[in-house]
Structure formats: C-alpha cells, structure tokens
Amino acid sequence: MIAAQLLAYYFTELKDDQVKKIDKYLYAMRLSDETLLDIMNRFKKEMKNGLSRDFNPTATVKMLPTFVRSIPDGSEKGDFIALDLGGSSFRILRVQVNHEQNRPVHMESEVYDTPENIMHGSGSQLFDHVLECLGDFMEKKKIKDKKLPVGFTFSFPCRQSKIDQAILITWTKRFKARGAEGNYVVKLLDKAIKKRGDYDANIVAVVNDTVGTMIDCGYDDQHCEVGLIIGTGTNACYMEELRQIDFGWGDDGRMCINTEWGDLGDDGSLEDIRKEFDREFRRGSLNPGKQRFEKMVSGRYMEDVVRLVLVKMAKEGLLFEGRITPELLTRGKFNTSDVSAIEKDKEGLHNAKEILTRLGVERSDDDCVSVQHVCTIVSFRSANLVAATLGAILNRLRDNKSTPRLRTTVRVDGSLYKTHPQYSRRFHKTLRRLVPDSDVRFLLSESGTGKGAAMVTAVAYRLAEQHRQIEETLAHFRLSKQTLMEVKKRLRTEMEMGLRKETNSNATVNMLPSFLRSIPDGTEDGDFLALDLGGTNFRVLLVKIRSGKKSTVEMHNKIYRIPIEIMQGTGEELFDHIVSCISDFLDYMGIKGPRMPLGFTFSFPCQQTSLDAGILITWTKGFKATDCVGHDVVTLLRDAVKRREEFDLDVVAVVNDTVGTMMTCAYEEPTCEVGLIVGTGSNACYMEEMKNVEMVEGNQRQMCINMEWGAFGDNGCSDDIRTDFDKVVDEYSLNSGNQRFENMISGIYLGEIVRNILIDFTKKGFLFRGQISEPLKTRGIFETKFLSQIESDRLALLQVRAILQQLGLNSTCDDSILVKTVCGVVSKRAAQLCGAGMAAVVEKIRENRGLDRLNVTVGVDGTLYKLHPQFSRIMHQTVKELSPKCNVSFLLSEDGSGKGAALITAVGVRLRGESAIS
C-alpha cells in the first residue's frame, strides 16, 4: 500500500516537473488578464475604425455590412433552399418553415465533397461544381421544376451592397479558385445556373457562415445578437446600430456586421503576442501575412502550431530524445481532433501515446505529459484571445444600449468549440473575468449555418410582404402636392362661404368675427387680469402693461387643473370652478378688492356680437359641460362671480386663443396679422378686410376673423383624404362627426390615429409579436410629448424602446422602427394639412390687397408646433410650396394667448376711453 502511494507520488511529482518545464519554455504564449484587456481595447479601436468611412480603407478589421437588418420573429413561412459553402464539405438543405405547425422548421440535407483540385482550380469550376451538387439534390427531392428561393452561406470575406449582392474580397480556408476574387458571387452562381439550363433558382440572400449561425439562433431566442464561429476558421458578427455605421444608410434600426476579425493584426499590431511558431507557420501557409489572428486561434492552424512546437522542442532535445519522424514534419498528419483527444481529462495521456505512436514517435511517459501540456497552452491561448475579442463586441453592445449591465445571447458554432473537451469552459471563464458586467447566454448551433441562410431568406420574404402591406396602409396618409393644392382650394371655398351672409349657415368654416379691429399702438397702460381656458389646464394671469419710451409687460400667473368630471358636468359647476380659481389667484397676489378689467381667452367656437359677448357654438377638446352651448360665456362668468359674492370683475373682452396668440406676437412684431394654434386643438385667425365680412356692419379698416377651421370637412368635403383610421378615431371622439380637420391635425388626436394603426399592424402580426396588450387598447396613451420624443432625430432606437416600455409596450428593435415610421407618416400629414390651410389664409390676404407679393408674419402657439421635432419644418415647407408669392415668417408665442387677452383688454379699455372723450 505504501509502495503504491510512493509510486503515485513519484509520478505526480514527475508530471508536475514536466508541466513546469513546458510552462517555462512556452511562457510567452501564456497571456495575462492585463494583456487580454489590452487586446480587447485594440480590437475595440479596430472595430470603430472599420465602421468609419474615413478609416475603413486602412482598417485591418473590415467590419463588413451584411444588409441583414432583422432576425426571425417566428412568423416566417415558406419553402427554401440553403447552400452552405465554407470548407472541404459542402452542404445543401431544403428548409420548410411554417410557424403554425408543431415542427415549425423541417429540414432535409445532403453533404457533398469539394475536392482539392476544385478548391484550387478556377472560379467557374468551383461554381459549376456547386450547381452540379444542387441539381443532384433537387433531383433527389423532386423539386427541380420549382423555382425556390435560395439562401447562400458563403463563408469568405465579401463586400456587400445589398443582401443579394456580395463581392468576394479574398479567399480563406485554403480556397484559391482563380478569377473569383473581386466578382459578384451571385452573378457567378447565376452564370453557372444558365450554363446548366436544367433548373432555375432565385438567389435571395448571401450571408457569411457567422451571420447564418446568429440568424439560426434568432428564431429560438430573440436576445441573440452575436454569432461566433470557432472551428476550422474563426469569425464573429453582431447587430450594430445603424447610427454607428458611417456609410450613410440611415440612423434607424440595426444591421448585422461581419467583423472578419481573423484579419486582426495583419498590420503588425499583434506582433508583441505572436511568437516564433506563429511566424514560422505563416511562411508556409497559403496566404502568408494574412489572417494573423485566425492563425493563432482557429482549429485549422492550431494543429500546426502544436506540431511546430513539438518539432522545435524535439530538435532542442526536450522531447522524444531529440528524434523527429517524417510524419511529425508533415503538415496534416497531426490534426485538431488529436489536440482535443489529448486534452481529455481521463484518457488524454492514453490518447497521446496512441497518436504519437501513429506519428512514428518513440515516446516516454514524460513526453506524453509534455505533449498534453503543449496542447493545453496552445488551445488555452486560443480561448483567451477569442474571449478578449468577443469581450470587445459585448462592451460595444453595452455602450450602444447605454445600459450598466448587458444581457445577450451568443450563438456558437465550430468544431473546436463543440468537440474540444476544455475549450468552451476556459473560454467562458476568461470572458466572465474580462467583462463582468455582461450576462451572456451561449447557445450551440445544432443545425449549422445552412439553416441560418434559409432563415435570412425567409425573413427577407416576410419583410418584403410586410413592407408591401405596410406601405399600402400608409400610402393613404401620404399626400401629393396636387392633393394639398386641392385641400387649399376647398378650404378657400369654405372661407368665402363663411364670410358671406347668405352662405354662412352652410359653411363648415364659420369665419367668426372677433370684433377686434385694432392691435396695440404702444399707449396702453395699466393692470389687467386674464383667463386662459382651452384645455385640461387653465391659467389666471395678472398682466402689468407700462407705456412710455420703453414699453414693458410684466406677467404673473398660476395654473389650475380642471377635473374631467367638471369638464363634462354642468355649466354652472364649470364656471363656479373657474371663479373659485380666480378667487384663489386674487388672494395669492393680494389684489382682491378693486374691480379690475379682465380679458377672457375662451378657446372654443363662439358667435360674437361684440368684443365682450360670445355665444358658445359647440364644445371641442373633450369639454361637454351642459347648459353652455347657445349661451353667452361672458354672462355665464359674470353670473358665477355674482354667486360667489367675493369680488367683481370688468369683463372687457372675450377672445379665442388663436386671436390672443396673434395679439401677443403683434405686440412684438407689427407685421403679425395671422394667428395659428397647433396643440391640443388647431385653429387659425387673420385680419380680414371689413368689406368682406358681411356678418358685421361697416366697410372700413379690418377685423380679426376667428376661422374655427377645425370644422373644415364636417360637410364631407374632405372625405376623400380621410382614412379608415380617421373615421375610427372620429367615431370614438366626444363630438363624433365634428372637427374633422382638427382631428387630422391636432395633438389630442394624432396619438389616437397612431394607436389605431399600431393595433391594425399588430393584428396582422407586424408588431409586438401579434399580441395586442392592454396598454395598446387604452385610448389616449400616445400623448403629443411621446410622439415628439419618438420622432426626435437625436433619439436612438434603444430610447424609443424605452419610451414604448414606459407606455407598457414591450418592443423589439424592428417594432421600434415601425412605430417611429407610423408616427412620422401621421405627423407629416398633419403638418402638410396645416400648411395647406395656412397657404389658403396668406393667399387670401395677398389677393385682398391686390399685391404681387405679400410679406406677413404668423404668430404661432401650441405644444405640437413647439415640441415636435419635424412638424414646424414640414409645415413651413408646405406653405412655401403652396403659396410661392407670399413670404411668410413664423413667430413663436412665448407668453401664450393669456397675454394676448390682456393686451386686447388694454386696447379695449383704451378705445373705450377714447370713445368716452369723443
């Protein structure tokens, strides 16, 4: 017993001694974490250079765009062929996809050899061979009469301009077919197909094997965004943000980037870690000086690096008693599978003995231990290097997502990763140390890269059909210049009808006289109260106007909320609430006492009979208070003041918010004679010649007309541009059938139009995996601020997804792109319609005055105009295109319509005083 223990101890000591000797001899091949982190940073820099238009030509890591922008979502259908060419074995698959069946993916495949003479022959010979094999496969499967879509996994560096257009940059993996480099791969295939003439095929997609691996995984795991090959060769791909790819393909979405990381170090940047064995092997390789990283990592080259180490050690008398056999000197006699066999835990040393015997080597137990440890060091270096470069990709993904911790899935394929007994464990362990802030799930590719090529093709087919249906739906929102000119013409007709006495009652655009005949002249002076009611929030203001050499306006205000139950309760409750808020404000300012002049901004359609009398025509914007329509709102306010018996008010003017906005801007800019609101609602006003205002006596000077253009189209004159989505939104609005133009423009309804389109697309399976969530069913979820945020140019898709998440909508990257597209189409139509309306207004002013050219300023207010990143630009452009004889400037109202009401009140008090004197 003691003797056995001593013997075991002796062999353990012997083994440890041999290991230490090998460690010392190959010390330079062991890489510290510090070195690996440095390599990680070098690769990260090379990735950035490869994605840059300026640095890409000189970058060693080419970061090739694949034009694969989407991964499978599980709804793909169809019958596809996949070709998988990347080594001495060539595979053809038939992949049938139907998500409605128990087995959503059914595959049949055949493996064909690619002889050495074909690999090193001409390009035409190679592709003739590929098509001969495909013909044989189709014959066997009895599908030669079908023209099936084909996905081609072509595992060599290609420069792609489309998903089906790929130019071969260079051969790798011992391929050297002449006349193929620099040519389009699909054209070479098509040429070979035509030459055969016995069948046809539609090449839809060309993908790298790494891309195929990643896409194959995407069908099972939506978190998969990295593909990794560690086998005969090595490479990685990942989903990059388009905004980070500096080649002008847009900012929205992602694209799979084929890194071609095997070229890392071809510029000499890895010479500090490349050793004499790497350099010696390079000289005898098919492509000396190229693929330097791959030659330190991949299985094809690992076997030769190990062999060269053994030869050198034998030459130095450190192994095999200095004897070298012809087999040991011959490339290909020692394989990667031998490395894997030698590194097995239990039978590794036994396998080493058998393999060395096969190589004709007389070996001792020490030799076997040494050979095993050499294999360990070389394969460990490979695992460490791959961990470093993958770590750089993971860090880039994390940075792109601006997240402190990354969660992602990596799909892995390759014989070295799959069959080596220690490789994956070592690789994972190193990766965890290098990127501790990433949670990575590794999924092994079971079906190879061919299925991935078929899935890319299936995705392309799905996206093409989805794109067709999406465009068909959104086309109804895209308005041509001719259509916009027609809208302008029809609105102008309605304006003329509204101004004439005999047709006013039939006009949808009421063209309401405001009885405002003058803008401030600078002599106004005093303290004025203003109320601003037009939505769920309303303001009470104290406005102090001082005239003199330097006119000033000082404002104090407080915002109050109107609960929904009061908005839709009784009129008495509404006005009592308003007066209660006024009372609070007077106490807040310490001015409850003297009877103060007040201007009332009342942002609803009113028929005015004087500056201080307005009869409510109809509620809009969600208000439904009873016993108000048909009544004078000033009287309702005065009655509420009397009921409270705390203070008195001198209500001088009731004005629309649009009129108030125009007055606010006119105080700053005298050429301002048009007002525009584009916010919760939409409306416009302008200064009309009194001779055209038949509803009011007098032909002198001008009067501001409150158009109430939101009702344009209520008579059906705009039905040809209304969509089914507009009709649904109108049907469920509080005042169905009314305010049709406003419903297509204003912020309160744009979100509803978007929501209904998204529901339709979700039902069709284009969004949110076809699942209509409870939040998506909720009316009003898409507020104007969310539309504005989603359409921001500066907002990355990740942030769009965060906004949708905030709304309770779990989205993919593709979902976010489509949501952003829908928002853009709906808001663009709104801006164009608003522009067409404004063009009609300024053209009328120009024609009224008989001018060849009009210079005019429009005062604008409203959250949609102010906050939306695209609305104002599109609207301005539309006005310019539709009214080319008008120079229109837009002035943003900074102080809102409340200030305008106070200014109108000040003008009214001034005119009242002048009238009393006269």
Curated annotation (Swiss-Prot):
Gene Ontology terms, MF aspect: ATP binding; D-glucose binding; fructokinase activity; glucokinase activity; glucosamine kinase activity; mannokinase activity
Modes of activity regulation: Hexokinase is an allosteric enzyme inhibited by its product D-glucose 6-phosphate. Hexokinase activity is inhibited by N-acetyl-D-glucosamine.
GO biological process, one term: inflammatory response
Residues reported to bind ATP 1: R30, D84, L85, G86, G87, S88, S89, R425, R426
Subcellular location: Mitochondrion outer membrane; Cytoplasm, Cytosol
Phosphoserine modifications at: S337
Reactions mediated catalytically: a D-hexose + ATP = a D-hexose 6-phosphate + ADP + H(+); D-fructose + ATP = D-fructose 6-phosphate + ADP + H(+); D-glucose + ATP = D-glucose 6-phosphate + ADP + H(+); D-mannose + ATP = D-mannose 6-phosphate + ADP + H(+)
Residues recorded as bearing N-acetylmethionine in the entry: M1
Residue span of region Hexokinase small subdomain 2: 521-655
Enzyme class: transferase
Alphabetical UniProt keywords: Acetylation, Allosteric enzyme, ATP-binding, Cytoplasm, Glycolysis, Immunity, Inflammatory response, Innate immunity, Kinase, Membrane, Mitochondrion, Mitochondrion outer membrane, Nucleotide-binding, Phosphoprotein, Repeat, Transferase
Region called Hexokinase small subdomain 1, residue ranges: 73-207
Record note on domains: The N- and C-terminal halves of this hexokinase contain a hexokinase domain. The catalytic activity is associated with the C-terminus while regulatory function is associated with the N-terminus. Each domain can bind a single D-glucose and D-glucose 6-phosphate molecule.
Protein's job: Catalyzes the phosphorylation of various hexoses, such as D-glucose, D-glucosamine, D-fructose, D-mannose and 2-deoxy-D-glucose, to hexose 6-phosphate (D-glucose 6-phosphate, D-glucosamine 6-phosphate, D-fructose 6-phosphate, D-mannose 6-phosphate and 2-deoxy-D-glucose 6-phosphate, respectively). Does not phosphorylate N-acetyl-D-glucosamine. Mediates the initial step of glycolysis by catalyzing phosphorylation of D-glucose to D-glucose 6-phosphate. Involved in innate immunity and inflammation by acting as a pattern recognition receptor for bacterial peptidoglycan.
Binding partners and assembly: Monomer. Interacts with RABL2/RABL2A; binds preferentially to GTP-bound RABL2. Interacts with VDAC1. The HK1-VDAC1 complex interacts with ATF2. Interacts (via N-terminal spermatogenic cell-specific region) with PFKM (via C-terminus). Interacts with SMAD5.
Entry protein name: Hexokinase-1
Taxonomic source organism: Bos taurus
Gene: HK1
